[in-house]
Amino acid sequence: MILLVSPKDVAEAHEAIEGGADIIDVKNPPEGSLGANFPWVIKETREATPEGMLVSAAIGDVPYKPGTVTLAALGAAISGADYIKVGLYGTRSYQEALDVMKNVTKAVKDSGENKIVVAAGYADAYRVGGVDPLIIPRVARDAGCDVAMLDTAVKDGKTLFDHMSIELLKEFVEETHKYGMKCALAGSIKIEEIPMLKEINCDIVGVRGAACTKGDRNEGRIQKDLVKEIVKVCRQ
């Protein structure tokens, strides 16, 4: 299982790289779960990241505005992101989610056929009126995405496992794999919860808080020693 770590600036990206993270995922925590950072931060992070190491960028907890979201996705791709992550926050149905992701995929793949598109839903979608997380694999498949992902929308200390049972998460992973895509799971995941994700054959685990001082995604800073500990668990 590979590790995605989400820095908010280049200094944190260096810590994540030195700690052994596999994917450097640029985000902006004050703007939400999948908060979008600025194009120059993505560009600077890409320049600071070793060649051959993948850079991801979240483009926000997005509304149902396909044109707006597609432009943001293209901006992230052009700024140097290899993975473009879209948080389907404001989509209320399969059709709305598909509409957003289909257009994003078209724009991103037109900019570079090796770019990777991630459709992200929320395990706690019921708290924010979002689309059912269990339809995300189907949305991702039908839109031509590469990865189906789950995160949590509300960052209040509750983790992915507080909102979905391990059985449901396993179902999500298996359906994603059945469609020939990779599966990524995140959501205030603690280091001791990572082995459970390995057991259900998750491909990518995403963290920020667990790699930050005081375990705080907002006030803390990513530290390479904490990243090293998480890498060790992922590799066991």
From Swiss-Prot:
Catalytic site positions: K27 (schiff-base intermediate with substrate), K85 (proton acceptor)
Top-rank taxon: Archaea
GO BP terms, alphabetized: methanofuran biosynthetic process
Manganese as UniProt keyword: no
Reactions catalysed, as given in the entry: 2 D-glyceraldehyde 3-phosphate = 4-(hydroxymethyl)-2-furancarboxaldehyde phosphate + phosphate + 2 H2O
EC number: 4.2.3.153
Pfam families: 4HFCP_synth
UniProt xrefs under SUPFAM superfamilies: Aldolase, FMN-linked oxidoreductases
Spans traversing the lipid bilayer: none
Entry GO MF terms: carbon-carbon lyase activity
Keywords for this protein: Lyase, Schiff base
Metabolic or biological pathway: Cofactor biosynthesis; methanofuran biosynthesis
HAMAP family named in the record: MfnB
Protein family (similarity comment): Belongs to the MfnB family.
Functional summary from the UniProt entry: Catalyzes the formation of 4-(hydroxymethyl)-2-furancarboxaldehyde phosphate (4-HFC-P) from two molecules of glyceraldehyde-3-P (GA-3-P).
Protein name, as recorded: (5-formylfuran-3-yl)methyl phosphate synthase
Taxonomic path: Archaea, Methanobacteriati, Methanobacteriota, Methanomada group, Methanococci
